[in-house]
């Protein structure tokens, strides 16, 4: 079982608890994802600010890890809503980009 497969199972179970009425739709999910991407970008800005010695608030790589995890969770929730197999989609897109730009590296999910 891949990490993504395990995440999907956990997302399915948690959504039954979180959204008992089933009202969360794709528009909500899209806004949720955008918010999490924005939070990740804000942490990156703070990390870069510190790297360049610019005054202002700081962040940690641990905070970035948390925000990126939220992005992945939200992306999976959207994929779940539309019945998308993210393992297959990621491999397909990664490999298509490699082919398009003439690179040899290909991605194959571990359990395929």
PLM regions: where:
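Flexible "arm" and connector segments at domain edges
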Residues: 1-112
């Amino acid at each position: 079982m891949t990490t993504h497969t395990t995440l999907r199972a956990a997302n399915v179970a948690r959504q039954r608890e979180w959204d008992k009425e089933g009202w969360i739709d794709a528009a909500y999910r899209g806004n949720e994802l955008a918010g999490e991407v924005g939070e990740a970008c804000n942490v990156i800005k703070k990390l870069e600010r510190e790297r360049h010695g610019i005054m202002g608030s700081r962040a940690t790589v641990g905070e970035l890890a948390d925000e990126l995890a939220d992005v992945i969770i939200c992306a999976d929730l959207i994929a779940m809503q539309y019945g998308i197999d993210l393992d297959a989609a990621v491999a397909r897109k990664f490999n298509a980009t490699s082919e398009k730009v003439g690179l040899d590296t290909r991605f194959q999910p571990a359990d395929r």
